[in-house]
């Protein structure tokens, strides 16, 4: 693994290795701390949009591994005043051992990675959220054991979370269903990847059909527009029936796990009652962002 830009960068063996290392690092941290695997290493934490979990978990993770993490808002860099991306990449690659970047366009991230000359990690783009999906898979494995054969259902907007969860779930040997309105389908290349897995992947616009007998149901914010705007009102109409409610989840397995990458808009993609009922696994999922990201850093920078 040279970078982590999207889930399809990983082989099934690499995915399993990341989860295994994350388990080890989590156990060590609970016992008092991990070895300084990143001693002398520097990590740029570059953010072009707001973040709570990604920023703080990377800051804490780099510190726990003995490295130095520097947060930077791209609006405060010369890149925010028009300096070409390729110049920023070539400069930061000479200062830092690794760059984490949360930005908008996946194409910008991939161009940056080609030029930086150091490992680059996707902290979220409009196309992919690999760190979050690694945390999801770690959480499922912790609570349910083997991932292979389990039914994973995503309900919501077929954007970054859906794209990454589909690929990650299939790489892990899961049966994956994506439930979304027709006009909010996942990326075309993700669907091409998924259809290679045949009956292990299913795409539907019917939430009740998709959730049937699911072991795990995941969702994410789908009303990403500014409240009160025409786009927001349109999304509220388009996603009627896609809220995770107790009634909808009746068709899933009785012990279904519910995951949410956060932040959650209660009353939109998930009801308050369902969120609170499944808060233990949702906040385990949030904690595991720290551990999987430490694993990725340890593999990329310390040969773990």
Across the structure, where does each feature detected by a protein language model lie?
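Active-site cofactor/substrate anionic-group-binding motifs, chiefly glycine-
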Residues: 42-43, 47-95
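Short, structured coil segments at secondary-structure junctions
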Residues: 65, 95, 115-117, 172, ...
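Glycine-rich phosphate/diphosphate-binding loop of Rossmann-like nucleotide-binding domains
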Residues: 48-60, 142-220
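Adenosine-phosphate binding glycine-rich loop
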Residues: 255-256, 261-304
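Rossmann-like adenosine-cofactor binding region
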Residues: 195-273
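Anion-binding alpha/beta catalytic cores of soluble intermediary-metabolism enzymes, centered on
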Residues: 90, 97-168, 260
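Positively charged, low-complexity intrinsically disordered leader regions
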Residues: 1-56, 60
